[in-house]
C-alpha cells in the first residue's frame, strides 16, 4: 500500500525503469512494509515551476497506511532523486499522506 509518485519537469529520466525499482526498494525499506505492496510512479515532462524558475524540479508524493517518517524519508528520497536525475534537493518538494486503511483499496477490498 505504500505509494510514491515522482513528477518532474525533466523531459525524460535516464533508465526510468531502474529508478522506479530503486524507489520501490527504498520505500519498502523506509516503511518496513513488504515491497509486494509498493507502487511507484514517474511522470516526466510535467510543466512546473519552482521559486519562479522553470529550471528542473520535482514534486514527490508519498502515501501509506501508517509507517511514514517524513524527516528521514525526505532526506533519503531527495538524495536518491538528486543522484539519479541531477535535480538539486533544493528544487524538490516531498508531501506525505497517512491514509486510513478503510480508504485504501486493493484486489477488490480495502485494507481496513
Report the location of each language-model feature.
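Interaction-mediating elements
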Residues: 1-112
Amino acid at each position: 500500500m505504500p505509494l510514491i509518485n515522482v513528477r518532474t519537469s525533466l523531459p525524460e529520466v535516464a533508465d526510468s525503469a531502474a529508478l522506479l525499482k530503486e524507489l520501490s526498494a527504498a520505500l519498502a525499506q523506509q516503511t518496513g512494509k513488504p515491497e509486494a505492496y509498493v507502487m511507484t510512479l514517474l511522470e516526466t515532462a510535467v510543466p512546473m515551476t519552482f521559486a519562479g524558475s522553470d529550471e528542473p524540479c520535482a514534486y514527490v508524493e508519498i502515501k501509506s497506511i501508517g509507517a511514514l517518517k517524513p524527516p528521514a524519508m525526505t532526506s533519503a528520497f531527495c538524495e536518491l532523486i538528486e543522484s539519479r536525475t541531477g535535480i538539486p534537493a533544493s528544487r524538490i518538494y516531498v508531501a506525505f499522506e497517512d491514509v486510513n486503511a478503510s480508504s485504501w483499496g486493493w484486489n477488490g477490498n480495502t485494507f481496513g
